[in-house]
């Protein structure tokens, strides 16, 4: 098992960044970061617990697809947990990756985005520090792209 965490500050309020990064991710991510996200589709559910989504990644990304299931979502406290359970994004060595996201208010009126990841590896497989670093950097890049998109398109929230 491998665990990784990071946090990023944002000028956007917790409610605005939660809406963009969680509720409207399916439509905003391909617009904000088309070099990473080709499409995101809901396979099952309505966005709540149990919802299953499929992500198709753009050409140039080192993997093509992933599927994840929403484990918990709390719109009042701006948090979500989901588990990636399928796709080459798991690199053949990860059985599943559970992500916990929380958006907290900051003193300046913005927010702090906290993200923790727990990876269950297959058999004796282990994630390298480089693997974990690449995942963290990719997620940070996506967060900043969505933040920039929302600032440029305030009607999105």
Curated annotation (Swiss-Prot):
Can the keyword Ligase be found in this entry's annotation?
no
UniProt keywords (A-Z) are: Allergen, Pathogenesis-related protein, Plant defense
Q: Which GO terms describe its molecular function?
A: abscisic acid binding; protein phosphatase inhibitor activity; signaling receptor activity
What's any GO biological process attached to this entry?
A: defense response
Q: What PROSITE patterns does its record include? A: PATHOGENESIS_BETVI
Instruction: Show the Pfam families listed in the entry.
Output: Bet_v_1
Domain of life, per UniProt, equals Eukaryota
Q: Which SMART domains match?
A: Bet_v_1 (SM01037)
Its Gene Ontology cellular component terms are:
cytoplasm; nucleus
Keyword Aminoacyl-tRNA synthetase on this protein? no
Protein family: Belongs to the BetVI family.
Task: State what protein this is by name.
Answer: Root allergen protein
């Amino acid at each position: 098992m491998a665990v990784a965490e990071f946090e990023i500050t944002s000028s956007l309020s917790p409610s605005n960044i939660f809406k963009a990064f969680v509720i409207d991710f399916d439509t905003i991510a391909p617009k904000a970061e088309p070099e990473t996200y080709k499409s995101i589709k809901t396979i099952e559910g309505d966005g709540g617990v149990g919802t299953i989504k499929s992500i198709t990644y753009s050409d140039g990304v080192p993997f093509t697809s992933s599927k994840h299931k929403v484990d918990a979502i709390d719109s009042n406290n701006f948090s979500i947990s989901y588990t990636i359970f399928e796709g080459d994004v798991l690199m053949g060595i990860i059985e599943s990756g559970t992500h916990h996201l929380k958006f907290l208010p900051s003193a300046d009126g913005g927010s702090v985005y906290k993200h923790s990841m727990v990876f269950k590896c297959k058999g004796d497989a282990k994630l390298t520090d480089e693997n974990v670093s690449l995942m963290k950097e990719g997620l940070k890049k996506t967060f900043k792209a969505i933040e920039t998109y929302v600032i440029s398109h305030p009607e999105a929230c």
